Amino acid sequence: MTKALFINGSPRKNGNTAQLLKRAMDGAREAGAEVELVNLYDRSLNYKGCMSCFACKIKGGKKGVCSFKDDLQPILQKAVEADVLVCGSPNYCGYPSAALRAFMERMEFPAVNYSDYSKPVVLKRICSATIYTMNCPNEEVYRQMNYPILMDTAAQQLGVFGPTEILCSYDTYQFPNYDRYDAATFDATHKAEVRDTQFPKDMEKAYKLGKRLVEQCKEDNSFEDAGQ
């Protein structure tokens, strides 16, 4: 069975990012995948980014997956063995969350081949995507803020494992009660309108994304099995 792993890089287990990931899971499940969600900010997880131990570069050592022993290592093992991988994160000051960046460091660096950069050390082909949520109002402002350089670059590095794509949800509803916070920049009425009109469309995009990735993975596997 196709295995699809979903990584929530938001501290909130039911926030905008998590909701989109769960909807993508619905699509993947509908397409026949076995799905699993990991919350990186779960208090039971104790880990950091790359520790520069270079264990993944030792001659004759284990290749293609981070072997540093901590709570993230088993999750990384699942990630490199998955058929589909979908990561999600809020935009924090123009970057993915620190938790997701640490995950990406640990997943992607073992794939870097210091003997031949053109031949990454990849254990299997993975169809992947990254879902971003943010206050940024639209794609035009997203580009004006140079977010493609800061955020898309991080997401596109997953392309070393196979085809990858990015889904952005703009102008998201951030607070349950805007009156409680110093946030005069935002129009609470407008935010609520976007939540009620645009966010459901983004949820549908996430559903189709999850389904599409699983279907793409199955097509790729069928092509390989046919020896073509």
Please identify what each model-predicted range represents.
Residues Y47-M51, Y142-R143, P176-Y181:
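Short aromatic-enriched loop/helix-cap "lid" or pocket-rim segments at secondary-structure transitions
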Residues V160, D179-A188:
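The feature marks non-catalytic terminal segments
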